[in-house]
């Protein structure tokens, strides 16, 4: 039987971009459980909560770039919506959603 040709090109997925009410943040510290401390691009430090649908599927470490949705009733807290991979962070920089300087400053 003939061997099938494999498609070496992987389809490029759309990068999740922040919509209204969401900010890009960098994880500063892990508190355990489902809580992290994040520094956001709007200049605020927030206590982030990792919801159950992400907790076991996506492992979040210090220095990761994440998308967060600040709470309306407590602006110093937020929910983590998405974790960006390094290639997705590069795509965000290429699309001028965020600058590389800002990410480096937030990572410390």
Curated annotation (Swiss-Prot):
Pfam families: eIF-1a. CDD domains: S1_IF1A. GO terms for molecular function: RNA binding; translation initiation factor activity. Coiled coil: none annotated. The keyword Protein biosynthesis applies. Keywords: Initiation factor, Protein biosynthesis. The keyword Protein biosynthesis applies. InterPro entries: NA-bd_OB-fold (IPR012340), RNA-binding_domain_S1_IF1 (IPR006196), TIF_eIF-1A (IPR001253), TIF_eIF-1A_CS (IPR018104). Residues 11-85 form the S1-like domain. Belongs to the eIF-1A family. Seems to be required for maximal rate of protein biosynthesis. Enhances ribosome dissociation into subunits and stabilizes the binding of the initiator Met-tRNA(I) to 40 S ribosomal subunits. This is Translation initiation factor 1A. It comes from Sulfolobus acidocaldarius (strain ATCC 33909 / DSM 639 / JCM 8929 / NBRC 15157 / NCIMB 11770). The lineage of its organism: Archaea, Thermoproteota, Thermoprotei, Sulfolobales, Sulfolobaceae. The gene is eif1a.
